[in-house]
Regions:
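A polyanion-binding, active-site-adjacent surface
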Residues: 1-218
Length: 218
């Protein structure tokens, strides 16, 4: 299955109850050849309306952090562990809520092949829920952000603070953790680039060895 075929199939997903109230499936966007994938928890109201990940206030702060790190948004791939908005409708007006474990598990049918097709070198988990889903269940974001962890979907994974959390903290103090977000993005990007270079060198060495074995190098 191609990436676009997977995206098209996801648009009709009925695997959990989030499908009944969604406006759009927010599959993800960006460079599918990127060595770095950013993964949040799930779309909010603005994302549900537009079908694009991280385009609300938190997304705008993420864009600012990417720019501060010297990285164009279009050069990475951005998605979420859950592709549909999770909302509480009990008051008649939808309010964002955390996806349930069942909803998150249901969406792995899209996330796992999505990452399998992209084949990123590094995954940057945006926020604690993403890290708990993709790194380890007892992940502690304030203590373990910015560190390298093994990943079943990439060479390594790093987690950082969620822009929504930073926005809340900025109401209390100026930086609110924004500088940490920028630093973690830079670290993840630089690690991804190093891994790309390492793979390229490995392939070049392999080609030299094969050429020598075949007597065609000189």
């Amino acid at each position: 299955m191609t990436f676009e075929e997977l995206r098209a199939e996801a648009q009709g997903c009925l695997a959990c109850n989030l499908s009944s109230r969604r406006t759009n499936v927010v599959f993800g966007e960006g460079n599918i050849l990127s060595p770095l994938v950013l993964i949040g928890e799930g779309p909010g109201d603005t994302e549900d309306k537009t079908g694009r990940p991280f385009v609300g206030k938190a997304g705008q702060l993420l864009d600012k952090a990417l720019a501060e790190a010297g990285i164009e948004r279009s050069s990475v791939y951005i998605t979420n562990t859950v592709k549909c908005r999770a909302a509480d409708w009990s008051t008649g007006r939808p309010m964002n809520r955390a996806p349930t474990e069942e909803e998150t598990l249901a969406c792995r049918r899209w996330l796992v092949p999505q990452l399998g097709l992209i084949k990123p070198k590094v995954i940057l988990c945006i926020g604690a829920p993403s890290a708990k889903n993709l790194i380890k269940k007892n992940f502690m974001i304030t203590k373990e952000r910015g560190q390298y962890f093994p990943s079943e979907f990439a060479k390594t994974a790093i987690a950082t603070l969620h822009p929504a959390y930073i926005l809340r903290q900025q109401n209390i103090s100026g930086d609110g953790g924004f500088s940490l977000l920028v630093a973690d993005i830079q670290k993840a990007w630089e690690a991804a680039q190093r891994l790309v270079e390492k793979d390229a060198m490995g392939k070049a060495d392999k080609m030299v060895i094969e050429a020598e074995e075949q007597g065609t190098l000189f």
